[in-house]
Amino acid sequence: MSGRPRTTSFAESCKPVQQPSAFGSMKVSRDKDGSKVTTVVATPGQGPDRPQEVSYTDTKVIGNGSFGVVYQAKLCDSGELVAIKKVLQDKRFKNRELQIMRKLDHCNIVRLRYFFYSSGEKKDVVYLNLVLDYVPETVYRVARHYSRAKQTLPVIYVKLYMYQLFRSLAYIHSFGICHRDIKPQNLLLDPDTAVLKLCDFGSAKQLVRGEPNVSYICSRYYRAPELIFGATDYTSSIDVWSAGCVLAELLLGQPIFPGDSGVDQLVEIIKVLGTPTREQIREMNPNYTEFKFPQIKAHPWTKVFRPRTPPEAIALCSRLLEYTPTARLTPLEACAHSFFDELRDPNVKLPNGRDTPALFNFTTQELSSNPPLATILIPPHARIQAAASTPTNATAASDANAGDRGQTNNAAFASASNST
């Protein structure tokens, strides 16, 4: 494989990108303590394109891969930590990850604060730098900690993490955006507050029915069977399959479908779900004609998991890990599943005694795929709290343009109240 950093996905059929006039403008100075301060001209992630100077310091590498490099830095004006994802930019096209992230504003999705371009060491090499929320942990590292201690993640955390993941998916799917790389490594966590944020939209794409997509997408262990069958007209339900794999992994303490190749992966899936029927294969990929699998019966889900696994967790898994893409629950339906009922209890707390993070501040955008589900998703105590905090007419206008992040959408609460 080439050592050249992989670019993130690019939007097709785009005109060449015009770089901002301040492109490549990067100044380095020293603060009073002698620390290196970098000042760039950056554009805010949301809102109008109004470039502004942003200064940061204490830069250090915290991750790298085929996509590029991720740095941690501290903003000089606020002292907040941020992550800066630096990726190779093809100047001929708009960067799809940037285009998608500028649309998104949700409490369970990592926020794009700014972006800026920088020059490479070689002539004509350009980098896109995404300045993102810094979140200290990942579901992958937390789960690995428990696994190494021969323990499983406490079920309350499984509920909190999966619920927030499904909320983030319901939100992006409402825009027709498919993440295409759901895995524990891409689920950021604040261990103190239990807030989860979905990150890394480098593989994400707005899916359009009838337009082909690459099937070699998504990380192994989490690839939906239709991708293994080579489907190119798949839907956002591939994210739901991946989320089901994450749920199963948190319950088991190890991946449910490990495999070093597509064939290995399929064998592992068949061991649990049984051999897919011809109809199921047709639903996954109508063009797939090879059918040479041994006939294996499905393994009972109750025997896949440990004896003390909550029945509701097993039931939810079985509704996510379905061969037929249309048979899988939608993310919003998953949020409404009885496995998450404990989170809707007004007295539930985190194990550390803190309140749970915001779980019911649904927006009309989030609920758009199935508005009646608001009656389940927004419990009575949350509706009462929302009604008590409803802004007066004088302040409502000023709040009208507030984003989704952490904002209580009173229209959503009202619809829930009216439906009950």
From Swiss-Prot:
Predominant place of localization: cytoplasm
The Protein kinase domain, residue ranges: 56-340
Compartment(s) where it occurs, according to its Swiss-Prot or TrEMBL record: Cytoplasm; Nucleus; Cell membrane
Post-translational modification: Phosphorylated by AKT1 and ILK1. Upon insulin-mediated signaling, the activated PKB/AKT1 and RPS6KA3 protein kinases phosphorylate and deactivate GSK3B, resulting in the dephosphorylation and activation of GYS1. Activated by phosphorylation at Tyr-216. Inactivated by phosphorylation at Ser-9.
Location of the region described as Disordered in the Swiss-Prot/TrEMBL record: 1-35, 387-420
Phosphotyrosine: modified positions: Y216
Modified residues (Phosphoserine): S9, S389
GO molecular function: ATP binding; beta-catenin binding; kinase activity; protein kinase activity; protein serine kinase activity; protein serine/threonine kinase activity; tau-protein kinase activity
Source taxon at top rank: Eukaryota
Lipidation (S-palmitoyl cysteine): C14
UniProt entry keywords in alphabetical sequence: ADP-ribosylation, ATP-binding, Biological rhythms, Carbohydrate metabolism, Cell membrane, Cytoplasm, Developmental protein, Differentiation, Glycogen metabolism, Kinase, Lipoprotein, Membrane, Neurogenesis, Nucleotide-binding, Nucleus, Palmitate, Phosphoprotein, Serine/threonine-protein kinase, Signal transduction inhibitor, Transferase, Wnt signaling pathway
GO biological process, one term: glycogen metabolic process
Enzyme Commission no: 2.7.11.26, 2.7.11.1
InterPro entries: GSK-3, Kinase-like_dom_sf, Prot_kinase_dom, Protein_kinase_ATP_BS, Ser/Thr_kinase_AS, STKc_GSK3
GO cellular component: axon; beta-catenin destruction complex; cytoplasm; cytosol; glutamatergic synapse; membrane; mitochondrion; nucleus
Residue ranges, compositional bias (Polar residues): 1-22
Subunit structure, as described in the record: Monomer. Interacts with DAB2IP (via C2 domain); the interaction stimulates GSK3B kinase activation. Interacts (via C2 domain) with PPP2CA. Interacts with ARRB2, AXIN1, CABYR, DISC1, MMP2, MUC1, NIN, PRUNE1 and ZBED3. Interacts with AXIN1; the interaction mediates hyperphosphorylation of CTNNB1 leading to its ubiquitination and destruction. Interacts with and phosphorylates SNAI1. Interacts with DNM1L (via a C-terminal domain). Found in a complex composed of MACF1, APC, AXIN1, CTNNB1 and GSK3B. Interacts with SGK3. Interacts with the CLOCK-BMAL1 heterodimer. Interacts with the BMAL1.
Protein name: Glycogen synthase kinase-3 beta
Encoding gene (name): GSK3B
